[in-house]
Amino acid sequence: MLSGVELSRDEALVLLRSDPANYLSLLAAAARLRSAYFGNSVKLNYLVNLKSGLCPEDCTYCSQRLGSAAQILKYSWLKSEDAIDQAEQGLAGGASRVCFVASGRGPSDRDVDRVAGLVGDFKTRNPQAEVCACLGILKEGQAERLKSCGVDAYNHNLNTSEEKYSEICTTHEFSDRTNTVKAAKAAGLSPCSGLIVGMGESDEELIDALFALRELGSESVPVNFLMPFEGTPLADTWLLTPVKCLQILCVARFVAPRSELRIAGSREMHLRSLQPLALHVANSIFLGDYLTSEGQSAAEDLAMIEDGGFVILDPRASAPQGGVEPVLRKRGAGTELQPNA
């Protein structure tokens, strides 16, 4: 693959099904690709949840879904100054990209104008920062509006394969997601799209999802591991092992060797003690907390990166010297408490 030869679906399936006892050999091969394209750098991304919960969509995996009984934070749009404060704390912690996220099917034109104003103010104060927006399914002209205000990237995950999609969501279709990614890319936004693993997908469905992402040209691929929130249809769904998670990440690297590969939601819960090894395959993480659950402390993230011999893209951050259930986020955006940054 270093010579430019692309991995086939059959080859990817063989690698995904390889003997778990030999995972270190798989990891070493994936690490060579990671090193060739990204050296020893790790990109830190920071999430700001602009609007939490009360989503009309019925995605089975999501704590913000229609009918969710998960005891998450629920709030409408943050004030612009509060969102910027949250984002700047992420930058101070070492993040080079801030991801502004809002729950819902997709934004109204008024919502896009609101985010455009926020991003404009944020970029004026922090011109070096990258901004990714994640607002749901886009309508005509909205991607262009976001691009014009300074948004650099747009996230809209495929989450799973087209074949499995109707099992995890009935309120919109797989094509709604692919069309949004295509629209973002056509508008000049960097396409960020990934998946969620551990939802009961078959090996073939997982491979199909990865190849769909490659065909879309996703430049940043977040790999989320299912958070089985109580109060959602997938509560108590535990189908992954740490080694299986590493195998999935390795295959993702082989399928898209030049893409930013991010270990994303629930990495702490599923990779557990093998989490540091994942940095030899992935070159990006979310710093601190997720949308509705807490991550490990920012200090632990920075220490893990430094201890592994990696460097952060933003040199301002440095590591300090010297249960598995999801923890509901009760700090940061939408609260009076300081964020985990």
Swiss-Prot record:
Q: Which GO terms describe its molecular function?
A: 2 iron, 2 sulfur cluster binding; 4 iron, 4 sulfur cluster binding; biotin synthase activity; iron ion binding
InterPro entries referenced in this protein's UniProt entry, alphabetically: Aldolase_TIM (IPR013785), BATS_dom (IPR010722), Biotin_synth/BioAB (IPR002684), Biotin_synthase (IPR024177), Elp3/MiaA/NifB-like_rSAM (IPR006638), rSAM (IPR007197)
Give the pathway: Cofactor biosynthesis; biotin biosynthesis; biotin from 7,8-diaminononanoate: step 2/2
Q: From its record, what is one biological process in GO terms?
A: biotin biosynthetic process
Pfam families associated with the record: BATS (PF06968), Radical_SAM (PF04055)
Cofactor (UniProt):
[4Fe-4S] cluster; [2Fe-2S] cluster
Q: How is the cofactor bound?
A: Binds 1 [4Fe-4S] cluster. The cluster is coordinated with 3 cysteines and an exchangeable S-adenosyl-L-methionine.
Primary role: Catalyzes the conversion of dethiobiotin (DTB) to biotin by the insertion of a sulfur atom into dethiobiotin via a radical-based mechanism.
Self-association state and partner proteins as the record states: Homodimer.
Question: What is the name of this protein?
Answer: Biotin synthase
Organism per entry: Renibacterium salmoninarum (strain ATCC 33209 / DSM 20767 / JCM 11484 / NBRC 15589 / NCIMB 2235)
Q: What is the lineage of its organism?
A: Bacteria, Bacillati, Actinomycetota, Actinomycetes, Micrococcales
